[in-house]
């Protein structure tokens, strides 16, 4: 059973590499544009493969159109990849938009913004303390 898992994982990795090459080099559909294959999850019986993709665009409508274009071309993409891989059965491809990368970048930007705001507040607060300490030092020297 463990051997089946490792075989499906190896097939998924090879399928990911082949799909990335086919989508970059062989697809001429302008609706798809630049696409990145993040991961491939192959079913145990090798009948289906979920292909997780991301695009350069973040607009939901454009992303949905691109996924639909990939789904429409899935049979053609499958035949191109089948010619490159030595499998008895080529899995049926299902393209899924992977929003985790976009969400991760958004969260990273939020954290960076909070850190820079916090540093600015600390610097401003530190400058105010320096001014109040220097005025206290001057008033002590006058006594």
UniProtKB/Swiss-Prot annotation:
Keyword annotations: Cytoplasm, Ribosome biogenesis
CC terms in the record's Gene Ontology section: cytosol
Disordered: annotated segments: 116-143
InterPro entries: KH_dom-like_a/b (IPR015946), RbfA (IPR000238), RbfA_dom_sf (IPR023799), Ribosome-bd_factorA_CS (IPR020053)
Function: One of several proteins that assist in the late maturation steps of the functional core of the 30S ribosomal subunit. Associates with free 30S ribosomal subunits (but not with 30S subunits that are part of 70S ribosomes or polysomes). Required for efficient processing of 16S rRNA. May interact with the 5'-terminal helix region of 16S rRNA.
Family: Belongs to the RbfA family.
Protein name per UniProt: Ribosome-binding factor A
Species this chain originates from: Shewanella sediminis (strain HAW-EB3)
């Amino acid at each position: 059973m463990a051997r089946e898992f490792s075989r499906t994982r190896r097939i998924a990795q090879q399928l990911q590499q082949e799909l990335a090459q086919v989508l970059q080099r062989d697809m001429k559909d302008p609706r798809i544009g630049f696409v990145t294959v993040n991961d491939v999850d192959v079913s145990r019986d090798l009948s289906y493969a979920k292909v997780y993709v991301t695009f350069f665009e973040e607009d939901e409508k454009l992303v949905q159109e691109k996924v639909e274009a990939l789904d429409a071309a899935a049979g053609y993409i499958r035949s191109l990849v089948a010619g490159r891989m030595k499998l008895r059965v080529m899995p049926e491809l299902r393209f899924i938009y992977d929003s985790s990368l976009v969400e991760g970048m958004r969260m990273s930007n939020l954290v960076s913004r909070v850190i820079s705001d916090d540093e600015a507040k600390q610097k401003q607060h530190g400058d105010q303390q320096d001014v109040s300490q220097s005025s206290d030092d001057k008033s002590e020297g006058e006594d």
